[in-house]
Amino acid sequence: MSTETWDGLTGAAWPSGHPLPLPAWGSFRGQPLRFASVERYEELAASLELSVQQLVQAHNYNSIGNFVRFYKEFCASGEDSLSHFYRHYEPPITEEHYTCVGLALELLQKLRRLDKKFPGLASGLFLASCEESIEDVDSYVSYDPCPRTVEKEHVLVALRIDIGGRLGVALLDPGYHVARVVTVMEDSSYPHTGWFTQSDQPHCRKDYGYSLTGNGKYVLWRDRRTMRDGLEEVYAALIYVGRPFLAPVSVTERRNLVYNTRSLVGRDTKGGLTATICVKIPREGDPVVTVSRQTGSGRNERRKFPLSSFISMSDSDILSWVAALAQSLNMAEVELANLMGDLAHALLDMDFRAQLLAINDDINYVAQDN
């Protein structure tokens, strides 16, 4: 799939002085997809779930590849100002480097093929935008999103549903490795999904819960993290389902390019993480790479390495990890080694890193009151 497949998703107004293009939304063309019974909806949900499970297994989440390409094109451009280059850059979407945007667009394509079996599905599916780390939920949901104060850093697939007169929304979120259909009913009754455990790692268990709010225009997504010492933290995100999102490439994919974390994640059909590579970008010093993988016995192994060590690749321990990770990520060893070496060159370019983090700061400032 290429960006050109999605005409109209890359263009958005970009006011001078604003760090991102303004997000744009469309209008729904019809009513929610109607089901005479819960059983008929369950038939659809089973088909949707199979599709999302196949997708998360077949495609890695990869925000490293698109970032490396962005850096190389910036260097080749001869530009000195990253912000100027960023404003004119059109982020391509390729299946080797899918983030939440590419995964959601790919899933939309696949699900629309089910329209013969479930008439109205193709026209009912839409992209929903999501704002993360919300401090004041009540204030946020009292209005439609303000284009100038949101960053819309995440997208997912949604479908409005009507089950015997009961309204709700079905969500599919391959970008966050959710390999199931999340059903959110207004009355919170079956088939409402409720809370479920998304991941259970030795250091932390993540539980997700979803509920409709804001007169049905928003889904409140709560991420509850329980540490092994008993400490619990709950994060709130808001998914806007009031209108279909029309700028996933121009806004969300572009925003992802300057985020201060890079990751490459392999998943199984249940959304379990088979391998992860994560790099948080500090303002100074050598970034740390955190890697983990599932062993054949189901045990989770985890290590940390300085990013610069991926340039020479002389450490036998790193070579061993690259080989194991490449297998879990369904990549060739040389491909993964080159990708990590390229990432190291990009992030050890201190002028580039400083400009990158400055853009990220500007975006965070715009959305700081959400």
Stretches with model-predicted labels:
Residues 75-148, 152:
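Active-site neighborhood of thiol-dependent amide/isopeptide-bond enzymes
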Residues 237-370:
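Extended, charged low-complexity segments
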Residues 24, 29-32, 41, 45-56, ...:
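Hydrophobic, Leu/Ile/Phe/Ala-enriched alpha-helical segments that form helix-helix packing faces
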Residues 4-96:
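Secondary-structure boundary elements
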Residues 127-288:
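His-Asp-centered catalytic microenvironments across diverse enzyme cores
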Residues 61-64, 98-108, 154-157, 171-176:
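Long, contiguous hydrophobic alpha-helical segments, chiefly transmembrane helices and signal peptides
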Residues 115, 159-163, 295-297:
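Short acidic, glycine-rich loop/turn motifs
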